[in-house]
Amino acid sequence: MARQTYNYHVTHFVTSAPDIRHLPEDTGIEVAFAGRSNAGKSSALNTLTNQKSLARTSKTPGRTQLINLFEVEDGIRLVDLPGYGYAEVPEEMKRKWQQALGEYLQKRQCLKGLVVLMDIRHPLKDLDQQMIAWAVEVGLPVLLLLTKADKLASGARKAQLNMVREAVLPFMGDIQVDAFSSLKKFGVDKLRDKLDTWFSEITPQQADKDDDPSIGE
């Protein structure tokens, strides 16, 4: 099937949900964005969609406590998962977030890809590795975006990229690693290309046909 290209600039907010049970129907295709509270996840979504405030950026990390859904077009959604790993969030709340994240990654059938964002200077913290492990466990492809890449000189950036690529080999999953900078618009094309690929693998129309037993009888 030929790969489609999508216009991410028309992406719009649909709804927020505290957990998987409150999400809309499990149809179409979703790609989720996950990352530590200060990894630049909201900034990356805003850069991708060319909208300054699609995903709210907060000066106080850890504010995104809900699963936020955005629609690119009918049946094609980007999902902003709760930021994790912020020290000042109470333990009970942390546990709830991690449970919601794990449940979403492992049970949401329309989820077709996971983007994990990590500060290029501090990659692969324990919770980042947990997200990757959950995704690989269910056969989900992963794009690791090393954010804030403008903070490092070219040589150091390449060294970090190579280090992370080596470090994720033991996960044995479909994992791609790229550098990204919202500030310099660095890596946006690669992100867009990967999303186009994931969203083109099965169209919502095909998904509906697959679900309808009367078709093809």
From Swiss-Prot:
CDD domains (UniProt xref): YihA_EngB
Gene Ontology BP term (one): division septum assembly
InterPro entries, per database record: G_ENGB_dom, GTP-bd, GTP-bd_ribosome_bio_YsxC, P-loop_NTPase
Binding site for Mg(2+): S42, T64
GO annotation, cellular component aspect: cytosol
PROSITE patterns noted in UniProt: G_ENGB
Keywords per UniProt: Cell cycle, Cell division, GTP-binding, Magnesium, Metal-binding, Nucleotide-binding, Septation
Gene3D superfamilies: P-loop containing nucleotide triphosphate hydrolases
Residues where GTP binds: 35-42, 62-66, 80-83, 147-150, 180-182
Required cofactor(s): Mg(2+)
Domain of life: Bacteria
The EngB-type G domain, residue ranges: 27-201
Record PANTHER family: ENGB-TYPE G DOMAIN-CONTAINING PROTEIN (PTHR11649:SF13), MSS1/TRME-RELATED GTP-BINDING PROTEIN (PTHR11649)
UniProt similarity note: Belongs to the TRAFAC class TrmE-Era-EngA-EngB-Septin-like GTPase superfamily. EngB GTPase family.
UniProt function note: Necessary for normal cell division and for the maintenance of normal septation.
Cited NCBIfam families: GTPase_YsxC
Protein name: Probable GTP-binding protein EngB
